[in-house]
Amino acid sequence: MNLRDKIAEYPNFPKKGILFRDFSPILKDPSAMESIADEFSKYFHPKNIDIFAGIESRGFILACILATRYNKGMMMIRKAGKLPGKTTKISYTIEYGKDTIEIQKDIIEEGQRVLICDDLLATGGTAKAAAKLIEKVGGKIVGFAFIIELTDLNGMKGISKYDCKSLVKY
């Protein structure tokens, strides 16, 4: 299946000069979601993954699709202040300032192997911070799974030490 055909494009969203690539049409097509799971299954072996981590918020969707396929658990990486209970946080630099993400403290056991999922890789800042956060609590990064990669923004550069797979590149 050509997933590129399923990705909608919205010029000047969320602001002028941005071309927003949206994978939402994939979600209404069960065969497209199945195709995504099939493609990542060729690349990441289930025996090498203990839990999937979804980056807020669209990464949750991909992580759930893959966790269901692999019969594994899923955890959420969220913006600060969005998770109940004790959390571990990390701050990182973004284009115009700082941002903070967090995970629940007890969600990962020491040594668990984690595949981090997100819909899109742009600059790689959030992805890199997510890896550092998981490693901070003792998780081992198996790699990254992205539906879309914006290659001009060189996001892979910051996470190149990890095994990374993106399905559609622009």
UniProtKB/Swiss-Prot annotation:
> Is Magnesium included in the keywords of this UniProt record?
no
- One GO molecular-function annotation for this sequence? adenine binding
For this protein, the record's InterPro entries field holds: Ade_phspho_trans, PRibTrfase_dom, PRTase-like, UPRTase/APRTase
**Sequence intervals crossing the membrane:** none
Alphabetical keyword list: Cytoplasm, Glycosyltransferase, Purine salvage, Transferase
List its EC numbers.
Answer: 2.4.2.7
> What does the record list as GO biological process?
adenine salvage; AMP salvage; purine ribonucleoside salvage
Q: Where in the cell is it found?
A: Cytoplasm
Taken from the record, one Pfam family name reads Pribosyltran
Reaction it catalyzes: AMP + diphosphate = 5-phospho-alpha-D-ribose 1-diphosphate + adenine
Top-level taxonomic group: Archaea
Pathway noted in the entry: Purine metabolism; AMP biosynthesis via salvage pathway; AMP from adenine: step 1/1
An annotated GO cellular component of this protein is:
cytoplasm
Q: Which NCBIfam families match?
A: apt, PRK02304.1-3, PRK02304.1-5
- Family listed: Belongs to the purine/pyrimidine phosphoribosyltransferase family.
Quaternary structure?
Homodimer.
Q: Which HAMAP family match?
A: Aden_phosphoribosyltr
Q: What does it do?
A: Catalyzes a salvage reaction resulting in the formation of AMP, that is energically less costly than de novo synthesis.
Protein name (database record): Adenine phosphoribosyltransferase
Tell me which species this is from. Nitrosopumilus maritimus (strain SCM1)
Q: Gene for this protein?
A: apt
